[in-house]
Regions:
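Residues that define the transmembrane beta-barrel architecture of outer-membrane proteins
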Residues: 210, 224-228, 255-259, 275, ...
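Acidic/His/Gly-enriched intrinsically disordered linker/tail segments
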Residues: 1-48
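C-terminal outer-membrane beta-barrel translocator/porin domains of Gram-negative envelope proteins
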Residues: 218, 278-289, 300-302, 342-468, ...
Length: 549
């Protein structure tokens, strides 16, 4: 594990908010702060800044100034007291560090090595002035340090190497930064690249190494059976600009390699409502039926928006994705095994602990079809602990060039979405009978009861509602209308009881009454019971690690 000292922990904790672009100015009033900033991020950020300022000034200058400030009972500003005691510049602390919510980003931009000396350029990304300490490290020991005034413009420095292993800016981590790894350069390599280190499970930053983490993983689906493998990733405790996540696995049932990967690059904007942009490239390859493999490659771009007031819960997302699917041909599916679909998504969310409201608007386009679909969710938690939830879904084909002979693969579905983009965690996505066909994924129509004619190639509208009865038992009801081309519209309904044993991860639905009639008296009632279940440990663990921001 990376070793972090007590004083270093102040900046380490302060950086959590900065890396997620959730931090606020230290000078804001309490009434304008989010809980995480009020209780943790800002106190730690101020503490880290004072510690850094004290180290920079030296000779107990800061301690003496704070003592004088206390004696004056705040009548004389600390900034003025410091100006009388020291000739060193302190405006950077009061005018920038405390008032600018964007963290510093110092970096060693250029490094030229000589026989016994080096020449390097230190830059601050936003041209903000700040003093920094330039260190030489050998055998994990600090052998030289020097404080340097940085005016905001690039600073060129020459110094003796002293046979050091590393040159580093602020090796003690006292100053919070948003990209600390670029503070270090390895002097024993011509390229300056740091050595690679493989570490079991994620950790905090080891600034002397380029880190890759790994740990074992397992998964399950009906066609690959149990899969086991290794997760390899560079994701640290704090968000990084570039992240890569590889999940190579071996399928015991198919006796072949499967898995997925994801790469992400983050662009943070601290001074805009468009506070975050992300570029993704993801891919996966598993089996969607016995001996039938699918591979999906998806480049995407996301833009995230929020109000300037971070206490507001309003959030918006705009995403554009290009899904490319390649499948082994299934004789039971007539459409081409390979296809590409453009998806454009807008998402709006305004939720708190009591009220949840969210909308999703999607447009999909391909050579075969174009469609628009919209969903909105509302959930309210009452003081008694009961909750009421309602969801609306509406979808319409804009064009549809799929012939009737090609089946309903791309159609809307009332009770079991086809998932032709392979986005949902179906355990048995091609099953029509058996336990895996009873898995419920809350998508499209959202019905729990099964109907013989549940797909629509023209339009579909449905409403799903549920209300708490007692603790984890709820009553649900659904109503919907669907229409196929050249056929009359049909209306369906269903109702029943939902047991939320582990909400969103393990739930069971018992149908009661539907368009089929009284469900418990129907033949093979057990086959109509639906369930929500995820076997992925990483997904289940998120139930216990949901962020509080």
């Amino acid at each position: 594990a990376a070793n972090i000292g007590f004083n270093e922990s102040f900046s380490f904790i302060a950086e959590f908010g900065e890396h997620g672009n959730r931090q606020q100015q230290d000078t804001l009033g309490k009434e304008r702060l989010t809980k995480i900033n009020e209780l943790y991020a800002i106190p730690y950020h101020v503490g880290a800044g004072l510690n850094y300022l004290g180290n920079y000034l030296g000779d107990d200058v800061l301690a003496k100034s704070i003592k004088s400030f206390s004696k004056s009972r705040g009548r004389v500003p600390l900034k003025n007291i410091l100006a009388e005691i020291t000739d060193k510049e302190t405006e950077w602390f009061f005018d920038t560090y405390l008032t600018d919510r964007e963290a510093y980003d110092l970096s060693i931009k250029r490094l030229i090595k000589g026989q016994e000396s080096i020449r390097l350029t230190v830059s601050e990304k936003n041209s903000k002035p700040v003093p920094f300490k330039l260190d030489l490290i050998k055998d994990d020991q600090l052998i030289s340090e020097k404080w340097i005034e940085h005016s905001g413009r690039d600073t060129i420095i020459e110094l003796k190497t002293l046979d050091a292993d590393f040159v580093a800016i602020n090796s003690n981590r006292f100053l919070p930064e948003k990209n600390r790894p670029n503070n270090w350069k390895y002097l024993k390599s011509n390229s300056g690249l740091k050595p690679l280190k493989l570490t079991f499970y994620g950790d905090s930053e080891n600034l002397k190494r380029n880190q890759l983490f790994y740990h074992p993983i397992s998964d399950f689906n009906a066609y690959d059976g149990f899969t086991g493998g290794m997760r390899i990733y560079n994701t640290r405790v704090k968000n990084q600009p570039f992240e890569i996540d590889l999940h190579p696995q071996y399928s015991l049932k198919e006796q072949s390699m499967v898995g997925f990967f994801r790469t992400r690059y983050r662009f943070i904007n601290h001074k805009s409502k468009n506070y975050l942009n992300q570029l993704f490239l993801t891919g996966k390859s598993y089996h969607y039926n016995t001996n039938l493999r699918y591979t999906s490659i998806q480049p995407s771009f996301s833009m995230y928006f929020r109000p300037y007031d971070l206490r507001s819960n309003k959030r918006q997302l705009f995403n554009i994705s290009w899904f490319n699917v390649f499948r082994d041909r299934d004789p039971n599916i007539q459409v081409s095994p390979d296809y590409s679909v453009l998806n454009i998504l807008h998402r709006y969310n305004n939720s708190d602990a009591v009220n949840v409201f969210a909308t999703n608007s999607n447009v999909e386009a391909s050579n075969e079809f174009g469609k628009f679909y919209f969903s909105t969710n509302y959930r309210k938690l009452f003081p008694s602990g009961r909750q009421f939830a309602v969801r609306l879904f509406a979808g319409k084909f804009l064009w549809n060039n799929i012939s009737a002979n090609d089946g309903n693969y791309f159609d809307f579905n009332l009770n079991r979405a086809t998932d032709y983009l392979f986005r949902y965690d179906y355990l048995g996505r091609s099953e029509d009978t058996g336990i895996w066909s009873q898995q419920f994924v809350p998508a499209e129509g959202g019905f729990k009861a099964f109907f013989d004619d549940s797909s629509a190639n023209d339009y579909m509208v449905s409403i799903n509602a549920s209300v708490g009865i007692w603790k984890w038992i709820e009553f649900y009801g659904d109503v919907g209308i669907l229409k196929n081309r050249n056929r009359s519209a049909k209306t369906y309904f269903d109702s029943g009881f939902k047991f939320s044993l582990v909400p969103d991860y393990f739930e069971i639905f018992f149908p009661l009454y539907s368009s089929n009639g009284f469900e418990p008296t129907q033949a093979r009632y057990a086959t109509t019971i639906r369930f929500v279940f995820t076997p992925r440990l990483s997904t289940l663990s998120s139930l216990f690690t949901r962020k509080w921001f």
